[in-house]
Amino acid sequence: MPLHLYPDVYASGSVPPGWIPTKGGTIKYPVRNPAVRRHLRELLPGRWQKVIKQGNRGEVHYFEHNSGQVAGVKYYAN
């Protein structure tokens, strides 16, 4: 599974220019899939969370490390 680390969601290239997160539109929960969690911890040891962020023109889904780095960024247009 090809997950790459990025400093933020915009650096991944998946989020279109002009996308702005909606205030209060963020859901965070622990990574439940053991295989994905194991792979993420191989990339960067520590705590990872699954994040779903609502924005002005769609949603962004990604995994976030405690350090703020992200992986597996996907954009879904509304």
PLM regions: where:
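Catalytic toxin/effector domains delivered as secreted proteins or via bacterial secretion systems
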Residues: 1-78
